[in-house]
Amino acid sequence: MRVLVTGGAGYVGCVLVQGLLARGCEVRVLDSLRKPGAPLVPLLANPKLEFQRGDVRDRRAVEEALRGADVVVHLAAVVGYPACERDPWLAREVNVGGTLNLTAARSPGQLIVFPSSLSNYGSVKDGLCTEEMEPQPLTLYGATKLEAERLVLEEGNAVVLRPATAFGLSPQLRLDLLFNNFMFLALNEGAIVVYQPHFWRAFIHVRDFARAILFAIDNAERMRDQVYNLGAEALNLTKGELAARIAERLGCRLQISEDGEDPDKRNYRVDFSKLEALGFRTQETINDGIEEMARGLQVISLPNPYSNASYY
């Protein structure tokens, strides 16, 4: 099987590429390298991995990358509320324009697996978010991912995943993600400050994220042209609960702030039963993530912990 991974040098992408190569797949990565490509360097010893430096906004680069691919995993994106607000034009160009290039250039027989986002749901006060609910994104990021979802589904032969917020170690580590950020603060500043601790979020380990993409490829016949929430009920937590678990394990100070508020207003609990009914289960727990991040952050030195944010 030949798989194209856009954004394959990113936080999720480089973990996914490892998994694909372990299966014996031929993998092509299309990435603009807005972040360093060093995480892919050890993998390039494998002759089944091909790297193409290019941008999904470049139609010719996309057409070249698609040649010979059986499956496309479209990860390339400007990710998250802060990054999209910082450069709204780029966010739309990459998240929507890049997806449009991909859907227009690929052949009908090429399966697209598209990781979208639970950010599409916005804020849901009562009940669990299901795939049947009408999305109400509150941020530009959520709006662009929802628009990209619709482009992918309109063309058909696609599987859309709406993943929870990722956490855990990756060769291309992101410390802007809520869990990872709390861990960084706990270990480096000795305290976690939490705004609006009652807000609900859902989480998924980056390795489970990659496993779910592999699951979607394997089960494309059953999952085709549908949307699936990706996560686990046990990983639905309030921000306060998450911070308390980290603080208890690491012995840091926990401060609940009543003075400020999080500009990201997402607040939801999510139902993951649709994907679980097909047999997918996450394997990594919050405690697993705390333990591995505590070990991993000992050897990481970043002058700016947010310097590697924004891209998958």
Question: What positions do the PLM features span?
Answer:
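Conserved Rossmann-fold NAD(P)-dependent oxidoreductase catalytic core, especially the SDR/UDP-sugar
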Residues: 74, 100-140
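Active-site Tyr-X1-5-Lys
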Residues: 123, 136-159, 187
